[in-house]
Amino acid sequence: MTVSPVALRRKTECKPHPTARYWKKCDVEALFGLPFLELVYQAAEVHRQNFNPREIQLSTLLSIKTGGCPEDCAYCPQSAHHNTNLGKEQMMDVDEIVEKAKIAKSRGASRFCMGAAWRGPKPKDVETVSAIIKAVKGLGMETCGTFGMLEEGMAEDLKEAGLDYYNHNLDTDPDRYNDIIHTRRHEDRMDTLGKVRNAGLKVCCGGIVGMNETRAERAGLIASLANLDPQPESVPINRLVKVEGTPLADAEDLDWTEFVRTVSVARITMPQSYVRLSAGRSNMPEAMQAMCFMAGANSIFYGDKLLTTGNPDEDGDRILMEKLNLYPLQFEPEGEVAEVEKASGIKADY
């Protein structure tokens, strides 16, 4: 059965698991309005009911094709519409990508995420990334791809190649979507999410805060994510990285407590999803990150670069995790890869 964009929106009577519900925007905004420590406490309780609170999923994100994107996303330095001095590059060589994945695994990452600056891939691009996915899967890692909007059959091809997750963010509140992006619609995002779900892929879907939105608009973003049916397996929460030359370079700074509130509300409304601290973490003090982990964040991007912007270095993350008595979630490979690891005794070194 085809999953249509409308079918992805959760209905009040549609409850695929006991903790799912339909979230009205006003109800999500009410959560945002709780006293700060009460909200964090509630989120921490929900988190402990669904996850080991000491486990953190480590993912590495690599830009395999950088710059020259035809989309005009106001936050993105890779857009060809913005003067950010970021040139258009060709896709990385397959062997180079696989070598990056090997390094990521040796340093503790269990998931390897690949991004390409496309509006959407061409059929020949899908063939190329499928070969990359197969090679990375052969290392015993989970794979995630973010390649833009997909045409019919592409999600199935990626699934057949071994892709585990497809990232396709909803970016912001649907009501202000075209204030941020003019070259596509919110409905276009929903269409690709429908194709991804129909192919049997897991969904990584989140958004960006700190783009001059109101609290009510942050609530709208979280409600739109929580009402996806089923809810995303991974929810990246990005804090805007302001890049000179983009329309949002002078955006007002988002108060750190408001970011923690966003993480908390995401955890409460999406109790079984991995909530990932994504872009903007390099500007977050350790205490702020610790509060986010308390509030239910249980995944980070690991490595000193996220596509084109900075990220905390690996040594710093190791030290922080040791301070907080956290440890990395290990991905358990299946099939032939699992047998090889079992026989060799080789595991990720963390």
Swiss-Prot record:
Pfam families assigned: BATS (PF06968), Radical_SAM (PF04055)
Molecular function via GO: 2 iron, 2 sulfur cluster binding; 4 iron, 4 sulfur cluster binding; biotin synthase activity; iron ion binding
Cofactor info, note text: Binds 1 [4Fe-4S] cluster. The cluster is coordinated with 3 cysteines and an exchangeable S-adenosyl-L-methionine.
Pathway the protein takes part in: Cofactor biosynthesis; biotin biosynthesis; biotin from 7,8-diaminononanoate: step 2/2
Cofactor: [4Fe-4S] cluster; [2Fe-2S] cluster
Catalytic activity: (4R,5S)-dethiobiotin + (sulfur carrier)-SH + 2 reduced [2Fe-2S]-[ferredoxin] + 2 S-adenosyl-L-methionine = (sulfur carrier)-H + biotin + 2 5'-deoxyadenosine + 2 L-methionine + 2 oxidized [2Fe-2S]-[ferredoxin]
GO biological processes: biotin biosynthetic process
Protein keywords: 2Fe-2S, 4Fe-4S, Biotin biosynthesis, Iron, Iron-sulfur, Metal-binding, S-adenosyl-L-methionine, Transferase
CDD domains, A to Z: Radical_SAM
Record flagged with keyword tRNA-binding: no
Binding sites annotated in the UniProt record for [4Fe-4S] cluster: 69, 73, 76
Residues reported in the UniProt entry to bind [2Fe-2S] cluster: 113, 144, 204, 276
Occurrences of domain Radical SAM core (ranges): 54-278
PROSITE patterns (alphabetical): RADICAL_SAM
EC number: 2.8.1.6
Subunit (UniProt): Homodimer.
Function: Catalyzes the conversion of dethiobiotin (DTB) to biotin by the insertion of a sulfur atom into dethiobiotin via a radical-based mechanism.
Family the entry assigns: Belongs to the radical SAM superfamily. Biotin synthase family.
HAMAP family for the chain: BioB
Protein name (Swiss-Prot/TrEMBL): Biotin synthase
Organism: Neisseria gonorrhoeae (strain ATCC 700825 / FA 1090)
Taxonomic classification: Bacteria, Pseudomonadati, Pseudomonadota, Betaproteobacteria, Neisseriales
Gene for this chain: bioB
